[in-house]
Amino acid sequence: MITLYDLVLQDDRRPSPFCWRAKFALKHKGLAWRDEPMGFTEKQKIAFAQSQTVPVIHDGPTVVKDSWAIAQHLESAYPEKPLFGPARHHAHFVASWVDSAVQPALFPIVVSDLYDPK
Protein backbone atom coordinates (compact mmCIF):
# COMPACT_ATOMS: atom_id res chain seq x y z
CA MET A 1 0.00 0.00 0.00
CA ILE A 2 1.14 3.53 -0.76
CA THR A 3 2.08 5.70 2.21
CA LEU A 4 1.59 9.46 1.88
CA TYR A 5 3.47 11.72 4.27
CA ASP A 6 1.19 14.69 4.89
CA LEU A 7 1.55 17.90 6.88
CA VAL A 8 -0.84 18.06 9.83
CA LEU A 9 -1.55 20.77 12.38
CA GLN A 10 -2.28 20.13 16.06
CA ASP A 11 -6.03 20.31 15.41
CA ASP A 12 -5.72 17.74 12.58
CA ARG A 13 -6.14 20.28 9.76
CA ARG A 14 -4.15 19.51 6.62
CA PRO A 15 -2.97 22.87 5.21
CA SER A 16 -0.61 21.78 2.43
CA PRO A 17 -1.99 22.34 -1.09
CA PHE A 18 0.87 20.21 -2.39
CA CYS A 19 -0.34 17.27 -0.31
CA TRP A 20 -3.88 17.96 -1.53
CA ARG A 21 -2.61 17.52 -5.10
CA ALA A 22 -1.08 14.15 -4.25
CA LYS A 23 -4.34 13.06 -2.59
CA PHE A 24 -6.39 14.24 -5.58
CA ALA A 25 -4.17 12.16 -7.88
CA LEU A 26 -4.40 9.08 -5.66
CA LYS A 27 -8.17 9.43 -5.36
CA HIS A 28 -8.64 9.99 -9.10
CA LYS A 29 -6.67 6.84 -9.83
CA GLY A 30 -8.73 4.88 -7.29
CA LEU A 31 -5.63 3.88 -5.33
CA ALA A 32 -5.64 3.01 -1.66
CA TRP A 33 -3.14 4.81 0.53
CA ARG A 34 -2.25 5.29 4.16
CA ASP A 35 -1.73 8.78 5.54
CA GLU A 36 1.34 9.34 7.68
CA PRO A 37 0.70 12.71 9.31
CA MET A 38 3.67 14.78 10.38
CA GLY A 39 4.00 18.14 12.07
CA PHE A 40 6.27 20.99 11.03
CA THR A 41 8.99 19.80 13.43
CA GLU A 42 8.88 16.09 12.50
CA LYS A 43 11.09 16.21 9.43
CA GLN A 44 12.93 13.10 10.58
CA LYS A 45 9.89 11.13 9.36
CA ILE A 46 10.85 11.92 5.75
CA ALA A 47 14.63 11.86 6.15
CA PHE A 48 14.70 8.58 4.17
CA ALA A 49 13.48 10.59 1.14
CA GLN A 50 16.23 13.20 1.49
CA SER A 51 13.48 15.81 1.63
CA GLN A 52 12.59 18.64 3.96
CA THR A 53 9.08 19.07 2.58
CA VAL A 54 5.92 17.09 1.92
CA PRO A 55 4.34 15.42 0.11
CA VAL A 56 6.42 12.29 -0.03
CA ILE A 57 5.07 8.89 -1.00
CA HIS A 58 6.45 5.46 -0.36
CA ASP A 59 5.12 3.11 -3.05
CA GLY A 60 6.65 -0.28 -2.44
CA PRO A 61 10.40 0.20 -2.91
CA THR A 62 9.89 3.53 -4.68
CA VAL A 63 10.12 6.85 -2.84
CA VAL A 64 8.86 9.99 -4.58
CA LYS A 65 8.84 13.58 -3.34
CA ASP A 66 7.13 16.66 -4.82
CA SER A 67 3.50 16.70 -5.92
CA TRP A 68 4.29 16.91 -9.66
CA ALA A 69 6.81 14.06 -9.47
CA ILE A 70 4.26 12.03 -7.50
CA ALA A 71 1.62 12.62 -10.20
CA GLN A 72 4.09 11.53 -12.89
CA HIS A 73 5.03 8.41 -10.92
CA LEU A 74 1.38 7.46 -10.40
CA GLU A 75 0.65 8.04 -14.10
CA SER A 76 3.50 5.76 -15.07
CA ALA A 77 3.04 3.05 -12.43
CA TYR A 78 -0.77 2.97 -12.61
CA PRO A 79 -1.80 3.87 -16.18
CA GLU A 80 -5.49 3.16 -15.60
CA LYS A 81 -7.59 6.31 -15.28
CA PRO A 82 -5.05 8.76 -16.71
CA LEU A 83 -4.48 12.03 -14.88
CA PHE A 84 -3.42 14.11 -17.87
CA GLY A 85 -4.35 12.44 -21.13
CA PRO A 86 -2.50 14.02 -24.04
CA ALA A 87 -2.24 17.37 -22.22
CA ARG A 88 0.58 16.57 -19.78
CA HIS A 89 2.60 19.65 -20.76
CA HIS A 90 -0.44 21.87 -20.35
CA ALA A 91 -1.09 20.38 -16.92
CA HIS A 92 2.49 21.09 -15.90
CA PHE A 93 2.17 24.68 -17.15
CA VAL A 94 -1.01 25.20 -15.11
CA ALA A 95 0.56 23.64 -12.00
CA SER A 96 3.60 25.92 -12.36
CA TRP A 97 1.37 28.97 -12.85
CA VAL A 98 -0.66 28.10 -9.74
CA ASP A 99 2.59 27.71 -7.77
CA SER A 100 3.99 31.05 -8.92
CA ALA A 101 0.88 33.25 -9.20
CA VAL A 102 -2.16 31.85 -7.40
CA GLN A 103 -0.69 30.33 -4.25
CA PRO A 104 1.36 33.40 -3.26
CA ALA A 105 -1.83 35.47 -3.47
CA LEU A 106 -3.77 32.97 -1.36
CA PHE A 107 -1.02 32.35 1.18
CA PRO A 108 -1.82 35.34 3.45
CA ILE A 109 -5.48 34.30 3.58
CA VAL A 110 -4.67 30.70 4.47
CA VAL A 111 -2.05 31.66 7.06
CA SER A 112 -4.35 34.17 8.75
CA ASP A 113 -6.99 31.45 9.03
CA LEU A 114 -4.46 29.03 10.53
CA TYR A 115 -3.46 31.52 13.21
CA ASP A 116 -6.90 33.01 13.81
CA PRO A 117 -9.50 30.27 13.30
CA LYS A 118 -13.04 31.48 13.77
What are these regions (language model features)?
Residues M1-K118:
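GST-like domain detector, emphasizing the conserved glutathione-binding G-site
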